[in-house]
Structures are given as C-alpha cells and as structure tokens.
Amino acid sequence: MLSGIVVTAVLSATAASALTYQNVSEGYSPADKTCEYLYRTFPDITSFSNQSSYIVDNTNFWSAASVLNPACVFAPSGAEDLAIAVKALKYYGSPFAIRGGGHMPIGDSNNINSTGVLLSSSGFKRLALSPDSSTLHVGPGNHWGDVYNFLNNTGKSIVGGRLGVVGIPGFITGGGISFFSWKYGWSSANIASVTGVIASGEVVTATPDNDFSDLFWALRGGGNSFALITEFEMITIPAPVVTVGTTSYGTTNLTKERWLDAIYNFALYGGEDCHECTVTPSASTGTQYPNGTTYTAMKFFDGNDTASPALSNWTSPYLNATSDTFAATTMTEWSQSGLAQFDSIHGLRNRFHVLSTYADRRALQIIHDTFFTLVPIHLSSLKTYIATLTPMPISKQYFRASKVRGGDPMDLDPEDGPHIWYEMSVLYTVERDEEYVSAFLQAVDEEVKKMLAAEGIKQPKYLYLNDADKGQPVFEGYPAENVRKLKQIRHKYDPEM
C-alpha cells in the first residue's frame, strides 16, 4: 500500500562519480557515514545529541512518541543544501526521516532512531508575499501561527490550520481542514506551486500546468512521500477580520443530546447555508475532568458576525454556554491565544484515530456512546489522561469548494456528502500506557463498525489522512484509479521506492 504519511526511505547506493565523499571513516553505519559527511560539509547546520539544536529538533513534537534520537539532525535553509544531503543519503544508503512542524503523533512519521538521519525543515522559515499579494511563499519550517502573524494588518489570510501550533507541510499534503474550507476547500486546493527535492537530488517546482503537474496533483492530498518540500506558494484570501472562539456548554445529559443534534443539523444545513461558518465540536473526559464529560465547540465566521443564523443551534437558548470566547478578532490574535494551553501539554504523548460516517443521527449517537462507554473500561488505570471525541460535520459545500481549482487524489464527490469525520484522541503521560490506549482505540473502532453494520448504517470508505492512526487503511478510501496514479507518480520520481 502507498505509505503516504511517512518519508523514511532507504535510498540505495549509486555511482560515486556524482559526488566526492572524502575521508569518511570506514566501519561506520550508513547513518554515521552520512552524518560525518554532512558535518564536514555543513558544520553549522548538522548537529549531534550533545548540541542544543539537535535537542530542539528531536524533542519539539506534538507527541513524545516522536522523540527517537536520530544519528544526527541536518537542518538546511536552502533547497540546494537539502539536495546535497539527499545525494549523500543515497550514496551511503542511509535511512532518513523528514520533519515539518512535528504535529503528526505517529512516532516514526516525523523522526527516526539512531539508524538514520533526521532532515529538519526548521531552517525553511521564509515568508514572502508576491508583488501583487495574490500568493504567499511559505517555508515548511513555519507553523500556522507564524503565517498568520506575518499576514497581520495585510487584510489577507491563507486557507491554513485552525490552530497556530500546527505545522505546515504534513497538514497541506494530507489535504488540510481549515476554518475557511467551506468557502475555499481543502488547504491543498489552494496551492499555487510547490518546490522540493526529489529522490535524484534535483530541485523542482511543480505547478498545475508545468512539466511537474503530476507531482503537483499528488501533493494535493496524497501525502508527503513524493518530494522533500522546501516551499509552498499559497493563494491568499481576503480576511481582515474573523469571528472565532471556543464555547463550553457543560456536562448535562440535555447538553449532550442538543450538542449531538447541533452537529447533525450543521452537517445537513449549516455548512450549506453559510459558507463562512465552521464548527469544530469536541467532547472530553478524563482525569482532568472531575465533573464528567464536557461538551464544547470551536465556532468560526469569516467576517464580523457573532449572530449568524447558521450558528444559532450553538448558542442560547438552544445550547447555553458556561463560558464563551466567540468574538471578532484576527487570525493573528486567535492563533496566539491558545499557545499557553498547548505549552502546558507539550512533551506528553498523544494518539489520533479517525472514523467516518455519513451524516446520520443514529451513527453519531452510536459513536459518541461507544467512545465514552469504553473510556473507563480501558483507560481507568492511567494516572493521567484526556480522551476527546471531535465529530467534524463536513457538508457537500466543502467537497464542492475543493474542486473549484482542479482535482485532488481524494476526489470526494459532493453528492456523496454530507459526512461526519470523527477524530478520536487520547492524551497521556507515559510510554507504558501505550498498550491501554491502543486497545481502547481498537475496541472503539471494532465496536462502532459492528454496531453500525447491525443497524444497516453504511460508512464512507474515506478516512482523513491527517487524523489517521498508524495502520489505518487511509488509501483504501481514495479512488482505486487515483491510488494507481499516485503509485506511478511516486515510482517516476523515486524509482527505488
């Protein structure tokens, strides 16, 4: 199966004539030889375990499961330097991993152990508007908070992440759900060009209509296994002011039922009636929630309006708030507002798992009840944990907007919608709890599928790549012809994969 979310490839050796690899120690592992070569060639951007830059790149992840201690870290700031590293990796036959913002919680999706080299995007921090401000050049070493901060006072934004702490490259190449997606589609639908290094060590720029248009298409949701990206050029959108915030609704049974009803109705009608509106509901329980499961929603309106009719089910008197930050602001201010909260959980362990259903109230109830019934059965022995269910209502309009600027590997049919995509996440503290978390997520997945089948409720095959757990069959949900095309494209640009 097409790996999609991981770029940890072993590139076999080729003739040495293309490079001069002098005075590299004999008897070292392929990774150690590569590290020595990179250090001799680029001493300022090659680091080892006793250096602060290595420590940052090896530990600054969304989940501590990604701290794997590579042989060395190479952090270039230019595409040509990265190209030299790719050729060295190929010559020595060293495994490697590439990291962007470090948000994917699957450990080996963005790091590698001492058998390989970590290529860090942290040096690719360029942010530059085009002369007419129609596009923004974005280096993959940024986070979305950096992007929104750069665009402050320009009246522009990007179809990017909903939280400032999220990284850039994995988000985009997995599709990317944005606040703005109901108007403009996937984040990946708003790429103007992508520059990166392919397996041969060549630096290429892919656009919809140049010689690398197939690569451009693959990177619009096919994952990051096609090139090492050094820059995105993203189409800008007008967004001088937005209305956004998080509303908490409490823990009562009535709140739960109305919260579920609101999700279902927004999937059917809200996203269709208001293309400026987005709702990201979440329900959380765990050791930090002594009063029981707490129901919240992150609400968004593209403009200045706290009373959009499409969001009425998320406000009083239907759902009464216990706290509310929904207010007019900017994407810059919003992206900075939650940093302290995320700093408080930095260094913990996290797992995602994704499910999909059509917009069906019975399915929504089944998944909610199954998730929260199985939490105490599987997770009660954990000293600290937070289990969260995030059912995201995805309207037909989302799929329509994603097709405006051409196709993508997901190729979701608007007439197949609306969907609800469920991100299940567990935050926990120690590695030994991994087996309990894995058993919990697997049990929810299996029980939900069994109960839905018993009720005659069909599920879409599509699973959102960016919320998927390791081993989930993401690409089985892509059209078979598109998967074949993705494999052909990957073989074209990396024949040894």
Please name every model-derived segment.
Residues 1-20:
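Fungal secretory targeting signals
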Residues 51, 62-124, 138-140:
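Glycine-rich N-terminal segment of FAD-binding domains in flavoprotein oxidoreductases
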Residues 106-125, 180-199, 228-232, 422:
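Structural signature of FAD isoalloxazine-binding scaffolds in flavoprotein oxidoreductases
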Residues 154, 158-194, 198:
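A gly/ser-rich beta-alpha-beta helix-loop segment of oxidoreductase catalytic cores
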